[in-house]
UniProtKB/Swiss-Prot annotation:
It comes from the Bacteria. The gene is accD. Gene3D superfamilies: 2-enoyl-CoA Hydratase, Chain A, domain 1. SUPFAM superfamilies: ClpP/crotonase. It is found in: Cytoplasm. Component of the acetyl coenzyme A carboxylase (ACC) complex. Biotin carboxylase (BC) catalyzes the carboxylation of biotin on its carrier protein (BCCP) and then the CO(2) group is transferred by the transcarboxylase to acetyl-CoA to form malonyl-CoA. Belongs to the AccD/PCCB family. This is Acetyl-coenzyme A carboxylase carboxyl transferase subunit beta. PANTHER family: ACETYL-COENZYME A CARBOXYLASE CARBOXYL TRANSFERASE SUBUNIT BETA, CHLOROPLASTIC (PTHR42995:SF5).
């Protein structure tokens, strides 16, 4: 114990020990800019200076999407857990428990239904923070359930993708979700219901090779990485240097792979306009 401990009263010492919250300031990965967390939250986690789009939680994204932030949580069917009894450094079941506790979600896909400028829509959000948003049986079932709900309600289906690809711990059962979700997309198409994909950072692997690139309209957030294999793998395969910005949203837009790149602040209005055009339904703002 030093002399300060003897001189400074206990109440003052407890005030001095009060810690600053860990997330009070957030550093931009692109520019290094420090942003006050509340300012970042108010700006939908887009860094004001650099325009870098950070990850947005499913709850925050849904609250921003639906009218007045009001929506209906849609249940998802239970899927078999760990059919292969997979284990690497730790058991797959232990990994699931860990991520469920961390994210307070059963898996990486969240479903919701509600109104977007007065129009009924069904939405799905992939959460990259849950096992890198990987596509497994639970995620596949959730996406198919969302599309089926859109069919039953005759509503547009919007999905926000964020994934590292198929979930390796589920092997062939994970890969099966690619054709299964593709069939569900085809059912939407046959019913003449809009299917809009919003590609967020990153969207890669088996997700890109299936439902993420089968939309009627493909939108991407600025700077999003979108592709199948990583650039290093491609360069080693073709033995050539890839162009600057390869697999970024802006590069894909300029080469006709996606339809538009939209700032997060403008996403809600853009989606409402597209749903209105595709369903020939006036928006609430237009009706007023």
């Amino acid at each position: 114990m030093n002399w300060i401990s003897n001189v400074v009263p206990p109440k003052v010492r407890s005030f001095l020990r009060r810690e600053t919250p860990e997330n009070l300031w957030v550093k931009c990965p692109e520019s290094g800019e420090l942003v006050f967390h509340k300012d970042l939250e108010a700006n939908l986690f887009v860094v004001p200076g650099s325009g870098y789009h950070m990850r947005l939680s499913p709850k925050a994204r849904l609250a921003n999407l639906f009218d007045e932030g009001i929506y209906e949580d849609l249940p998802t069917p239970e899927a078999p857990v760990d059919p292969l009894k997979f284990r690497d450094v730790k058991r797959y079941t232990d990994r699931l428990k860990e991520y469920r506790a961390k994210t307070e979600a059963q898996d990486c896909v969240k479903l919701a239904a509600g109104r977007l400028e007065g129009m009924e829509i069904v939405a799905a959000i992939q959460d990259f923070d849950f096992l890198a948003g990987s596509l497994g049986m639970a995620a596949g079932e959730a996406i198919i359930t969302g599309m089926t709900t859109a069919l039953n309600r005759r509503a547009p289906f919007i999905i926000f993708t964020a994934s590292g690809g198929a979930r390796m711990q589920e092997g062939i059962f994970s890969l099966m979700q690619m054709p299964r979700t593709t069939i569900a997309v085809q059912r939407l198409r046959e019913a003449n219901l809009p299917y809009i994909v919003v590609l967020t950072n990153p969207t890669t692997g088996g997700v890109t090779a299936s439902y993420a690139m089968l939309g009627d309209i493909h939108i991407a957030e600025p700077g999003a990485v979108i592709g199948f294999a990583g650039p290093r793998v491609i360069e080693q395969t073709i033995r050539e240097r890839l162009p600057e910005g390869f697999q970024r949203a802006e590069y894909l837009e300029s080469h006709g792979m996606i339809d538009m790149v939209v700032q997060r602040q403008d996403m809600r209005a853009t989606l409402a306009r597209l749903c209105s055009i595709l369903t020939r339904t006036p928006r609430a703002s237009e009706a007023a």
